Amino acid sequence: MVSASPSGKITLGYWNLRGGPRGNVARYLLAYGGADWNEKTYTIGEDEWKNEKGTVMDFCNLPYIIDGDFKISETYAVHNYCAQKYCPELIGTTPQDKARCHQL
């Protein structure tokens, strides 16, 4: 079972893929924003993810973020959360700027 990191670090869960594009964006956002995080990676074809999936959170998918008691999954939600929390200057301040960022 995956739970919040005892060190208070965020946990990022994703597939153990070389250059996995969806996981990399979250990593880039966390690094750019100066976050301290742990990674939990899963190997495709092994049962670890299948066995843990229901214990992480309801409706869990990869990537996911666990930040204390807050848990969220799905690529867009994870990216949006990381950007808002750690590097809000990247997502704009006006509705127009935010919309432009969302279309990227």
Where are the model-predicted features located?
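GST-like domain detector, emphasizing the conserved glutathione-binding G-site
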Residues: 1-104
